[in-house]
Amino acid sequence: MVYKYHFEPIPSEWLSDPVLSRTEPLVLQILANRGFKTAAEVSDVLFPDFSAVIKAVGLKDMDKLVERLSRALNGHEKIVVYHDYDVDGICGCTIMVENLRRMGGDVEFYANDRLVDGFGMCPNGVEQIMKRWPETRVILTVDNGIVAFDGVEAANKLGVDVLITDHHEPGAALPSAYAVVDARRKDETYPFRDFCGAGLALKAMSALARRLRRDVSEVCRSADMAALAAVSDVVPLHGENRTIVHEGTRVLTNGDRPAIRALNTVKNVARVTAHGTVAFTYAPMINAVSRMGQDTRHVINFLMEPDEGKCRKTALWLDEVNEQRKAETAREEDISQKMLAEENNPDPECIVLYNDSFKEGIVGIVAGRLKNRYNVPVIVFAPREPGLIKASARSVPGLNLIETLMMLPEYTVKCGGHAAAAGLTIQKADFDAFKDAFTKLCHDRNDISKNNVSPPLDAIVDSSELNEEFVRSLSALEPFGEGFPEPLFGLTADIDEVRFMGQGQKHVKYMDTRHNVSIIEWGGGDKARAKAEPPCRFVGHLELNEFNGNVSVQMIADQGKK
C-alpha cells in the first residue's frame, strides 16, 4: 500500500493567536496538514464549548416536544421511552429516563425484542406498552420512529401522543406524531445534521430543563452516555458531535457513574479514551446483551444504578455475555471465510452471504469485519421467521448503501439505514436473485473504493525524535473517531532486535533499542520470518507503553503495511 503525505505550512494567523501560539507545534502541524484553515476552526477542535451545544436551539418540533413533556410532567402523566436495542438506543434511553425522573416524571421504558419485532416502533410494541402500563399517555422515542407509520397510528388510535426523536433518514413523508425531531428532516434548517440518537436525547432533555427552569448542569452529567453512543454509532466527530464526545469522555474519565466505575474495575481500565476504551470496551459489552438475545432493561437499570455492589455484579455478567458474543462471532467469521473460499473469487466487488446457523444479532459484526478486510460492500443474512432472512449490511466510500438497496424494491420486504450501514429483510427464496442483482449494481458503480486507497499520513518522523512528551502532546487532539482519526505516522527506525509474541508466535515486535522505540505488528509474524532483514520504515499509530514504572514509545503498525 502506498501512503501519501501532504505538508501544509502552519498559517501565520494561528501562530499569532494568543491561545494557539501556546499549542504544541506538532498538534498545529497535524491540523494544518488535515486542511484546517482558520484559527476559529482549530479552536473549535482543540477547545470545544459544550455550553454552546447545550444552549443551541432551533431544531424543528423541539418546542412542541418540550411543551408536551412539560405538560406530562406537570400533570403526572405516564411517559414511556421507546428505545432501540443498540448502544445508541440504550444510552439515549438512559439519558431520557434518568433526567425525566429527576424532574419528577412517571417514566418507564420499552424496547422491541429484536428477534420478534426487529427495529423501530411498531403496533405490537405499542400493544405491549399498553398491556404493561395502560395509563400511558405519552410515548417518547429515541433512536427510532422516523418511519414508524404503523406504530404511530396504533398509538394515535389509543389517544397516546407520540414524540419522535430519531437520527435516521426520513422517507418522503413523516409519521403523524405529535412532534418529530430529526435533524435529517427534509425541511430542517438547523446547521448540524449528524447527531446520533443519544445526542438528540441530550439536547431534548437540556431544552426541557430550561423550560422548567431546572439546573441544566444536571443534564450535562448525562454527556457520558451521549459520548458512548456517538462513538458506538460511528457518527462523524465534527461540529456538535465532537463537542459532546469531548465533554462526555471527560465525564467518563471522572468516573461519576457507578456503572462505569464497575466496568473500569472489571476490565482494568487505566485511562479512558473515545477511540480505545469507549469503542472497544464499553460499547461491545453493552451491545452484546441484545446481540445474544438478552433483555436490554438490565443494561439501562445498570447504567442508572447507584449501588456499587450491584453494579460490579452486573458488570461481571456483561463481561460474560460479551465473551459468549466473541465466541459466536469467531464461529460465524470462520464459516464466512470458508464460504468465500468456496466461491473462489479473490477480488469480489461485493460480498453477500447467508447461512442457516448465523444469528441475527451477530451478522452486523461479521459484515463489518469482512468489509474492513476486503474493502467492498458486505451483506450477511441470518434466518428470520419462516420463509424470511434478515441481514446487516456495511458499505465502503463510493457506494451509498441505502440508496442502492432502495433500487431493489422487488426483493426487499423491509429496508432501512444509512449510506454506510443498513438492515434489510428478504424472502429466503429470493436470496440468489437478490445477490445477483446487488452484485450487478456494485459492478455498475465503478466509484467504489478499492484496496489501493490508503489514508494520508499526518507526519513523518524518525525514532530519534520520539519521546514521552512527543506522544503525550497528541492527546490535545482527542477525541479521535469517525471523520477525525487518530494521527497516522510514517516512522523510520533502526531495528536491532525482533521478537515474536502470542500463541503460535503470530505477532511480531520490532525494536529500536537505541531510542527505546518498539513497533508491534499484530498478525505479522509469518511475514517477518520470511524477510532476510527487518524493515526500517513503518506506518502506524503512536502510544506509550507503561510497564513496571518504565515508559517507552510504541507504534502499533498498520497490519502488513509498511
Regions found by a protein language model. Give the residues of each.
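Hydrophobic helix-and-loop "lid/oligomerization" segment in the mid-to-C-terminal part
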Residues: V2, E8-V138, L158, A209-A433, ...
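Accessory interdomain/linker segments of ATP-dependent helicases and helicase-like nucleic-acid enzymes
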Residues: A459-V517
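Beta-strand/loop nucleic-acid-binding surfaces
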Residues: R514-A530
